[in-house]
Amino acid sequence: MKLNPNDVVIIDAVRSPMGKTKNGVFRNVRAENLSAALVKELFKRNPNVDQKDVEDLIWGCVNQTLEQGFNMARAVSLLAGLPITCAAQTVNRLCGSSMSAIHTAAQAIMTGQGDVFVVGGVEHMGHVGMMHGVDVNPALSKHMAKASMMMGVTAEMLGKMHGVSREDQDAFAVRSHRLAHEATLQGRFNNEIVSIEGHDADGNKILVEVDEVIRPETSMESLAKLAPVFMPKVGTVTAGTSSALSDGASAMLMMSAKKAEELGLTPIAKVRSMAVAGCDPAIMGYGPVPATKKALKRAGLTIADIDIVELNEAFAAQSIPVLKDLGLLDLVDDKVNLNGGAIALGHPLGCSGTRISTTLLNVMREKDATVGLATMCIGMGQGIATVFERV
């Protein structure tokens, strides 16, 4: 494929192992250090790239307080040893934060506002709880129900609207854990995971090389024993069919096609199109549908043209309606989350956008696929989507 000079290309993409939020392997590792380790690895893997050429480090993070506050991206840049001339910004689009980082860098490259960018995101949910310090404006009650701030309740509503059964959700979750476990055993995550120091249950320092949150023992029988967690007695969404709480980071090295050619680098893929969209906060999990439709239209594609899909599995009750309305439900085993999703791997909020994009690019390479879609829902009613094309 012939690239145009201002095409946006991905040179490399990595992530940390996903650690459990409660007493997990990264309980003694700060979010900035988890992030900086990935940035260092990107340049270790790509020595031809001069760090002085980096225009901006753009880092997604949702709860920007405590160790994740005060423009954490700048701390990540400095801790990673990037030159002081490299700028840095922290972005927040809730669950879509690090995918927004991809979009921000892509838009800059497309308009000639820089050639080399480092993007990514992190969330240490063990150190900074999801709702820590949140103070919601009471006036929002005029525009959305209070329950719209409770993601699990919105998943219950979306599932009910689309007739998603408890059994359907349990089966979806079992699949996620099974595929993630198989991918781990078969080494399919090896190219994307960067080993990072952490601590075992006894406090001994260890090198963490695989995801801690996958539960290979998950079965229909074990999930059937779980009670609904968000709407007791009447609900269907359980902890087992929700994305796992986890700590993790992910990162990408992006540049213009012109710069990649100048450096003699072979890109993994190019950004074909991008989109964000709003939806009713009460069914925030539906956001990938309008966002994906926008992105496909901008790329001049239909969903049939997409070879591989990574959908962030916030909840099974949310994922199934999205796949149904995108025309993918009958193609799940051929195209969707082939190495498992967030139900198994976890959803460290600010990390997930570049995490699912990283996994997508690796699956595309493994399957020799041409076009891939990464998309996710966003709290308070949004969706975000990116179409990638291998080059």
UniProtKB/Swiss-Prot annotation:
Enzyme active site: C95 (acyl-thioester intermediate), H347 (proton acceptor), C377 (proton acceptor)
Keyword set includes Transferase: yes
Statement: the UniProt record of this protein carries the keyword Cytoplasm: yes
SUPFAM superfamilies: Thiolase-like (SSF53901)
EC top class, as a word: transferase
Keywords: Acyltransferase, Cytoplasm, Fatty acid metabolism, Lipid degradation, Lipid metabolism, Transferase
Gene Ontology molecular function, alphabetical: acetyl-CoA C-acyltransferase activity
Intracellular or extracellular location(s): Cytoplasm
Associated pathway: Lipid metabolism; fatty acid beta-oxidation
E.C. no: 2.3.1.16
One Gene Ontology term, aspect cellular component: cytoplasm
Transmembrane segments: none
Catalysed reactions listed for this entry: an acyl-CoA + acetyl-CoA = a 3-oxoacyl-CoA + CoA
BP GO terms, sorted: fatty acid beta-oxidation; phenylacetate catabolic process
Pfam families assigned: Thiolase_C, Thiolase_N
HAMAP family: FadA
Subunit structure: Heterotetramer of two alpha chains (FadB) and two beta chains (FadA).
Family classification: Belongs to the thiolase-like superfamily. Thiolase family.
Described purpose of this protein according to its UniProt entry: Catalyzes the final step of fatty acid oxidation in which acetyl-CoA is released and the CoA ester of a fatty acid two carbons shorter is formed.
Protein's recorded name: 3-ketoacyl-CoA thiolase
